[in-house]
Amino acid sequence: MKKSKSKKKAAKAQEVEVKEPVKEPEPLPELEAAEDLQDLPEPDPELLASEPELEDLADPLDLEGPLEADLLPEEGLLEEEEEELSLPKVSTSDPVRQYLHEIGQVPLLTLEEEIDLARKVEEGMEAIKKLSEATGLDQELIREVVRAKILGTARIQKIPGLKEKPDPKTVEEVDGKLKSLPKELKRYLHIAREGEAARQHLIEANLRLVVSIAKKYTGRGLSFLDLIQEGNQGLIRAVEKFEYKRRFKFSTYATWWIRQAINRAIADQARTIRIPVHMVETINKLSRTARQLQQELGREPSYEEIAEAMGPGWDAKRVEETLKIAQEPVSLETPIGDEKDSFYGDFIPDENLPSPVEAAAQSLLSEELEKALSKLSEREAMVLKLRKGLIDGREHTLEEVGAYFGVTRERIRQIENKALRKLKYHESRTRKLRDFLE
């Protein structure tokens, strides 16, 4: 089967080479490279990332990887993806299987095809600028209308991330205005449509790359579909930023953007209590340092050892605080055991409740107090209970007790002193209470 597939691909490649190039309109002025990628160096085979570096880049929380360091052997990776898509190793539902089947129908692109599509995308963006200047319409509106005419209005409504999604009426109005342009400007409309079609083709041909990367991040707090969705956003960003003149393989370039989009989504959405992205990077670095020290020492490193390895500005207290932030929250309703008849919260002690020993002692003390106070009059016993907080745990003032009985505060003081003298005089009544003081 593999040989027949390779023969078909070879025959298809020959057909592409034999076809005469389509006559293109007058070339547009060259665009300037994206500002945030100006410093990207030319790829050097001797500087390709080594295997340990690639393992670090694969860390699900590593957001620090430089763009030029993420040069992977993408040809082998994409061949593996083509086989893995039919039988994904992760748990999937029917919508995921259907999605994998659909994207598996799009053939992979050669380097020459990627460059050709990227060139058309770039020319299309420049053409949209020209149309915006000529018509006064917003560039984003023109781009979305052109996209809607290619994909269909129903599909454009489902595209996530658009600030304003044009309705069918707006699409037809703007499209009619664009079609009524002079002949010399219609050339730009044709180029813009070709650029949008090339953009869509470049995205669809690399959707399997997103799936391959997203599978490495399962179990991190986001569902598989959410990971794919976030990775697709990174892929779209990569298409917009790709510079074909540097002759990078697009899958190599897009890998960094896809990982970054997934990593940021995990940092923002996966936790119940959100942690800032910069703190996620710090936690990731701290975890790598702790793992490295554990391998070197053969034991769990102390906070002081980790702080020393982290460098200036770190101490044991900061290490401890950072590790506490990294802890995952656990629901009190999490089932425990195979039968799942108990919950995690059932095994957490309530620090506000007394221990069984303290509760038993408190019960015995209450009984002895009742016996001692039973020898006093009802009013004297109630005054002592209110003044000493034996009823509600709060010691009431003389004014409060006086208001309760409808007498003055001085009269309450007299009743209290008389009751205490009775208890002190009859020591046999209070002897057992003294045992609770020890």
Curated annotation (Swiss-Prot):
<feature type="region of interest" description="Disordered">
    <location>
        <begin position="1"/>
        <end position="69"/>
    </location>
</feature>
<feature type="compositionally biased region" description="Basic and acidic residues">
    <location>
        <begin position="12"/>
        <end position="26"/>
    </location>
</feature>
<dbReference type="InterPro" id="IPR014284">
    <property type="entry name" value="RNA_pol_sigma-70_dom"/>
</dbReference>
<feature type="region of interest" description="Sigma-70 factor domain-1">
    <location>
        <begin position="93"/>
        <end position="128"/>
    </location>
</feature>
<dbReference type="Pfam" id="PF04539">
    <property type="entry name" value="Sigma70_r3"/>
</dbReference>
<dbReference type="InterPro" id="IPR028630">
    <property type="entry name" value="Sigma70_RpoD"/>
</dbReference>
<feature type="region of interest" description="Sigma-70 factor domain-4">
    <location>
        <begin position="372"/>
        <end position="424"/>
    </location>
</feature>
<keyword id="KW-0805">Transcription regulation</keyword>
<dbReference type="InterPro" id="IPR007624">
    <property type="entry name" value="RNA_pol_sigma70_r3"/>
</dbReference>
<dbReference type="InterPro" id="IPR012760">
    <property type="entry name" value="RNA_pol_sigma_RpoD_C"/>
</dbReference>
<dbReference type="Pfam" id="PF04545">
    <property type="entry name" value="Sigma70_r4"/>
</dbReference>
<keyword id="KW-0731">Sigma factor</keyword>
<protein>
    <recommendedName>
        <fullName>RNA polymerase sigma factor SigA</fullName>
    </recommendedName>
</protein>
<keyword id="KW-0804">Transcription</keyword>
<dbReference type="Pfam" id="PF04542">
    <property type="entry name" value="Sigma70_r2"/>
</dbReference>
<dbReference type="GO" id="GO:0006352">
    <property type="term" value="P:DNA-templated transcription initiation"/>
</dbReference>
<feature type="region of interest" description="Sigma-70 factor domain-3">
    <location>
        <begin position="281"/>
        <end position="359"/>
    </location>
</feature>
<dbReference type="InterPro" id="IPR013325">
    <property type="entry name" value="RNA_pol_sigma_r2"/>
</dbReference>
<dbReference type="InterPro" id="IPR000943">
    <property type="entry name" value="RNA_pol_sigma70"/>
</dbReference>
<feature type="region of interest" description="Sigma-70 factor domain-2">
    <location>
        <begin position="202"/>
        <end position="272"/>
    </location>
</feature>
<dbReference type="InterPro" id="IPR013324">
    <property type="entry name" value="RNA_pol_sigma_r3/r4-like"/>
</dbReference>
<dbReference type="GO" id="GO:0016987">
    <property type="term" value="F:sigma factor activity"/>
</dbReference>
<comment type="function">
    <text>Sigma factors are initiation factors that promote the attachment of RNA polymerase to specific initiation sites and are then released. This sigma factor is the primary sigma factor during exponential growth.</text>
</comment>
<dbReference type="InterPro" id="IPR007627">
    <property type="entry name" value="RNA_pol_sigma70_r2"/>
</dbReference>
<comment type="subunit">
    <text>Interacts transiently with the RNA polymerase catalytic core formed by RpoA, RpoB, RpoC and RpoZ (2 alpha, 1 beta, 1 beta' and 1 omega subunit) to form the RNA polymerase holoenzyme that can initiate transcription.</text>
</comment>
<feature type="compositionally biased region" description="Acidic residues">
    <location>
        <begin position="52"/>
        <end position="69"/>
    </location>
</feature>
<dbReference type="InterPro" id="IPR007630">
    <property type="entry name" value="RNA_pol_sigma70_r4"/>
</dbReference>
<dbReference type="Pfam" id="PF00140">
    <property type="entry name" value="Sigma70_r1_2"/>
</dbReference>
<feature type="compositionally biased region" description="Acidic residues">
    <location>
        <begin position="27"/>
        <end position="45"/>
    </location>
</feature>
<feature type="short sequence motif" description="Interaction with polymerase core subunit RpoC">
    <location>
        <begin position="226"/>
        <end position="229"/>
    </location>
</feature>
<dbReference type="GO" id="GO:0003677">
    <property type="term" value="F:DNA binding"/>
</dbReference>
<dbReference type="GO" id="GO:0005737">
    <property type="term" value="C:cytoplasm"/>
</dbReference>
<feature type="DNA-binding region" description="H-T-H motif">
    <location>
        <begin position="398"/>
        <end position="417"/>
    </location>
</feature>
<dbReference type="InterPro" id="IPR009042">
    <property type="entry name" value="RNA_pol_sigma70_r1_2"/>
</dbReference>
<feature type="compositionally biased region" description="Basic residues">
    <location>
        <begin position="1"/>
        <end position="11"/>
    </location>
</feature>
<dbReference type="InterPro" id="IPR036388">
    <property type="entry name" value="WH-like_DNA-bd_sf"/>
</dbReference>
<keyword id="KW-0963">Cytoplasm</keyword>
<dbReference type="InterPro" id="IPR050239">
    <property type="entry name" value="Sigma-70_RNA_pol_init_factors"/>
</dbReference>
<keyword id="KW-0238">DNA-binding</keyword>
<comment type="similarity">
    <text>Belongs to the sigma-70 factor family. RpoD/SigA subfamily.</text>
</comment>
